[in-house]
A protein has these predicted regions:
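Signature of multi-pass transmembrane helix bundles
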Residues: 1-64, 123-128, 135-286, 368-410
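Membrane-spanning helices that line or support transport/gating and their immediate boundary helices
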Residues: 71, 75-83, 293-308, 386, ...
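Short amphipathic alpha-helical coupling elements at transmembrane boundaries
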Residues: 43-54, 81-86, 229, 300-311
Length: 410
């Protein structure tokens, strides 16, 4: 049994715990039947529900872009392919640079890879779980949640995170190379040359983004927000066209990928968008409860880590929450000290969703890449903490307001 299978078994163990809690909650709660053990698992049933209900949000983000992937590859290929080949990189790296793996990056990378499966995995699941999500999801979402005064710390944190993405990708690529990734029984050949050469365009983009965040942070962040709005519009067009094609047979956009199984698809080998989303939700049934319970059971050690980093408890809790989803962390930012805000924003660039949506996506689409993806994301998360700590102005590490601390513990 490989490490990827072990991870899946662990998540399914937590899924069963959460299922038991959800059942017992109908009859008075787990604590009533299981005592202290029941009290320690209470609430996991709610996370079980959250995991399955994520299907709707995932569908809105994924289906349209998945359907559009071959169309976009056809339109962008004449520009992207020669440009990336000139740099010595595979064109699929374009997809993971701008799109999250679960927002079309994985499928667009496949279309642009030209049959190079290793480059597709490298871009679609490793790079596409770090840089792409930051640009199209994390920054726009954060701007709608955080206080305007915290935008500066968001920019500083993202700056630190973007700079360390190449390190994260190389770490994930090396794990993939040495762990012997196989897909449908065929080995996927990751090489040093592939891992390093494909970082050239990523480093160029990372440097440009970092310079922009350093010298014109407001304009850069607003630019990401505008890009995200156009992306939502594009995804909606793709979704509407794909649904009309499925229900009425009208091909409004030629070349759309089917969103349900099509004639000739082999069950278990070809997964279309709707089936992928269902598979991700099944994984999240265990992933969300796992994060909740591990956070609860190991609260004291986690708080000690926060003390070592010299951040308050709310900031330490935000880092743990980020491993599943960074939206709760952004909501907690106003209750963090300045150092904690920068570290959390930096940490979320690589580490966000490592035990949540991205884990579910990798498990549903290419479970051989679960371990390399998680290692890459966590290496990035750890590495970026040091960079973020260097970037925080020592004279501006303002503690969170006292009333916010009180609210946090009430």
């Amino acid at each position: 049994m490989g490490i990827n299978e072990i991870i899946m078994y662990i998540m399914m163990f937590f899924m069963l715990i959460a299922a038991v809690d959800r059942i017992l909650s109908q009859f008075g709660g787990s604590a009533r039947f299981l005592g202290k053990l029941g009290k320690s698992i209470e609430g996991s049933g709610g996370q079980f529900e959250e995991g399955f209900m994520a299907m709707g949000a995932l569908g809105l983000a994924m289906v349209g872009m998945t359907a559009l992937a071959p169309v976009l590859a056809h339109l962008l290929g004449p520009v992207i392919i020669p440009l990336y080949e000139m740099l010595g990189a595979n064109p699929s790296m374009f997809a993971g640079t701008l799109l999250a793996c679960d927002m079309g990056g994985f499928f667009l990378a496949k279309e642009l890879a030209g049959g190079d499966v290793a480059a597709w995995m490298y871009s679609g699941l490793i790079l596409g779980s770090m840089m792409g999500p930051t640009i199209v999801f994390s920054i726009p979402v954060a701007l709608g949640i955080i206080e305007p005064t915290d935008r500066r710390w968001l920019a500083l944190g993202v700056l630190a995170g973007i700079v360390t993405i190449p390190i994260s990708c190389i770490a994930g690529g090396l794990v993939a190379m040495y762990s012997g990734v196989e897909i449908n029984g065929q080995p996927v050949e990751f090489t040093f040359a592939l891992i390093l050469m494909n970082m050239i365009p990523v480093i160029i983009v990372a440097v440009l983004v970092a310079l922009g965040l350093k010298f014109i942070p407001e304009k850069m962040i607003n630019g990401f927000q505008i890009f995200a709005k156009f992306l939502v519009a594009l995804i909606t067009i793709g979704l509407a066209a794909a649904v009309i094609k499925f229900l009425l047979g009208w091909e409004l956009i030629p070349g759309l990928d089917p969103i349900f199984m099509a004639p000739g698809d082999q069950p278990g080998e070809v997964m279309r968008a709707i089936e992928v989303i269902g598979s991700i939700s099944c994984v999240l049934l265990g992933a969300y409860p796992m994060v909740l319970l591990l956070t609860r059971w190991f609260e004291k050690p986690l708080m000690r880590v926060g003390n070592l980093l010299k951040i308050n408890n709310m900031a330490a809790g935000g880092m743990v929450a980020t491993l599943a989803n960074n939206i709760p962390m952004f909501g907690m930012m106003k209750q963090m000290d300045t150092r904690g805000k920068v570290i959390n924003c930096a940490f979320s660039v690589s580490a966000a969703f490592a035990l949540g949506d991205h884990l579910g996506f990798a498990a549903a689409n290419m479970n051989a890449m679960i371990f390399p993806m998680i290692v890459g994301k966590l290496v990035g998360g750890v590495t970026v903490i040091g960079v973020a700590m260097l970037l925080v102005p020592k004279d501006e590490n303002v503690p969170a307001p006292a009333n916010n601390e009180a609210e946090a513990h009430s």
